[in-house]
Regions:
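Active-site PLP attachment segment
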Residues: 168-212, 237
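Structural detector of well-ordered beta-strand residues that form the stable sheet scaffold
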Residues: 50, 75, 96, 149-150, ...
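Conserved active-site segment immediately N-terminal to the catalytic lysine
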Residues: 151-186, 215-217, 222-227
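N-terminal "arm"/small-domain region of PLP-dependent enzymes with the aminotransferase-like
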Residues: 1-26, 225-227, 355
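Phosphate-binding glycine-rich loop
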Residues: 26-73, 86-91, 97-99, 164
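PLP-dependent aminotransferase class I/II
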Residues: 33-38, 43-49, 110, 114, ...
Length: 378
C-alpha cells in the first residue's frame, strides 16, 4: 500500500535527541530551541521566531498578542483546519467566515472588505497547500482599517510571496511541524513569528507562562515573576532537537518533494486539460513548497469513487477539510444566518489529496498517475 503520508527521518534525530538528554536540559529554550529559532530568523529574516508546542499554540499566542476578546470579530476562511478559528474563539471572539477563491482554496481577498464591521480586529489568511494568499490586497485592507493580520502558514514553510517569506508579511505568522508537514518536530511542534517590534517582549512573556523569565536568563532582571497572561507554549528540547535534524536537511527535503510534485503535474496535466479535474493553481507571485498535490474533482460522488478506486489500486488518497461554517459547533454558537460560501463548499466536496512524502518512490508516483488515468477511462 502506498501511504498518503510518511514522516521522513534524516538519521540525525536520535543523535540530537540523545545530546539533549545528555545535557540534562529537557524543558525547552535550551541549545536546540535556540538553534531552531536562529535558523528561521537568519534564513527568512523573521524579526522574532518563537518555537511552540504546536501550530495551534502559535495561533493562540497570536490571538493573545492581538488582544482579541469578547465582542471582537475575526475574519477566517471557512476552508481551513479548525485551529485557524478556534484560537480566536478561545479568546471570546466571533468568527466571520469568508469564502475561498474560485480557482484555489485560499481566502478570496476581494470578499474580505465587505465582511469588515466596527468590531473587526483580525484577518487570518491561510496559505493553503503552502501557496500564498493575495497578501498585497490583504495588507492594504488591514492597514486601511487598522486591523491585525495573522498568517496561518501551517503548511507554508519555505514558501514565498513576491520574494517575501510567508509568515513574515503580516503582524504574526504561525507554522506547524506536525508529522504531516514538510518537516516535523517529532510529530508535533510549531513556530510563531513576530514581525512587529512592538510585540516581541510581550510575546516572550506569554510564551513563558506570563513571566519575564526570558529576560531573567538574558541577565536583564535579577529575578523573574508573573507580569502578564500566558500559558505553557514552550516545547521540550527533545522536540526541538528532532526538528533541528530536519532543518539541517530542509533543502534536500524540499528538492525531493518538488520533484514528486512536478511528476504529478506533468503526468496529469493532459488529463486535467480534458476537463476531468483541476489541479493546483500557483500564481506567478507565489512559489510552490510542494507541501501537497491535490485534484479538484467535478462533484462529491466522483471524488468518493476516485478515492475508493485508488485504495483498490494500493494508493492512499484522502479528502481534506469540511466547511467550518457548516460545522455543528458553529451552527450551535452562531447568531444569525449561516453564510453561503459556494467555493468553500466545492473544495470541501471535491478536493482529493494524493500521496506526498520524501520517500515516495518515482515508480509509486507513476502507479498513482496511471491509476487516475485508468479511473477516468483514458
Amino acid at each position: 500500500m502506498i501511504p498518503f503520508n510518511k514522516p521522513f527521518l534524516t538519521g540525525k534525530e536520535a543523535h540530537y535527541m540523545y545530546q539533549a538528554v545528555y545535557t540534562g536540559k529537557l524543558s525547552g529554550n535550551g541549545v536546540f530551541t535556540k538553534k531552531c529559532q536562529q535558523f528561521f530568523e537568519e534564513r527568512y529574516g523573521f524579526r522574532k521566531a518563537i518555537m511552540t508546542t504546536s501550530g495551534t499554540d502559535a495561533l493562540e499566542m497570536a490571538a493573545i498578542l492581538c488582544d482579541v476578546g469578547p465582542g471582537d470579530e475575526v475574519i477566517v476562511p471557512s476552508y481551513t483546519f479548525v485551529s485557524s478559528a478556534l484560537a480566536f474563539v478561545r479568546q471570546g471572539a466571533r468568527i466571520i467566515f469568508a469564502d475561498s477563491c474560485e480557482n484555489n482554496p485560499n481566502i478570496d481577498a476581494d470578499k474580505i472588505e465587505a465582511l469588515i464591521t466596527p468590531k473587526t480586529k483580525v484577518i487570518v489568511p491561510v496559505h493553503y497547500a503552502g501557496v500564498a494568499c493575495d497578501m498585497d490586497k490583504i495588507m492594504d485592507i488591514a492597514n486601511r482599517h487598522n486591523l491585525f493580520v495573522v498568517e496561518d502558514a501551517a503548511q507554508a514553510i519555505d514558501s514565498y510571496y513576491k520574494g517575501k517569506p510567508l509568515g513574515g508579511i503580516g503582524h504574526f505568522g504561525c507554522f506547524s511541524f506536525h508529522e504531516t508537514k514538510n518537516v516535523t518536530a517529532g510529530g508535533e511542534g510549531g513556530l510563531l513569528t513576530v514581525n512587529d517590534e512592538r510585540f516581541i517582549r510581550r510575546a516572550e512573556i506569554i510564551w513563558e507562562k506570563g513571566t519575564n523569565r526570558a529576560e531573567f536568563f538574558r541577565g536583564m532582571v535579577n529575578k523573574y515573576g508573573w507580569v502578564d497572561t500566558g500559558s505553557s507554549f514552550l516545547p521540550s528540547e527533545i522536540n526541538s532537537a528532532f526538528l533541528w535534524a530536519q532543518l539541517e536537511s530542509l533543502d534536500t527535503i524540499q528538492d525531493r518533494r518538488k520533484a514528486i510534485w512536478n511528476q504529478y503535474h506533468e503526468g496529469l496535466k493532459d488529463l486535467a486539460g480534458m476537463g476531468s479535474f483541476t489541479m493546483p493553481d500557483i500564481p506567478k507571485c507565489a512559489t510552490n513548497n510542494a507541501h501537497m498535490f491535490y485534484l479538484v474533482c467535478r462533484n462529491l460522488e466522483e471524488r468518493t469513487a476516485l478515492i475508493s478506486y485508488l485504495k483498490e489500486k494500493g494508493a492512499g488518497a484522502v479528502f481534506h477539510y469540511l466547511s467550518l461554517h457548516l460545522s455543528e459547533f458553529y451552527k450551535d454558537h452562531h447568531v444569525g444566518e449561516i453564510p453561503k460560501l459556494p467555493n468553500c463548499d466545492r473544495f470541501a466536496d471535491c478536493l482529493v489529496r494524493l500521496p506526498m512524502f520524501f520517500e515516495l518512490m518515482d515508480e509509486d508516483v507513476q502507479i498513482v498517475i496511471s491509476s487516475i488515468w485508468n479511473f477516468y477511462g483514458k
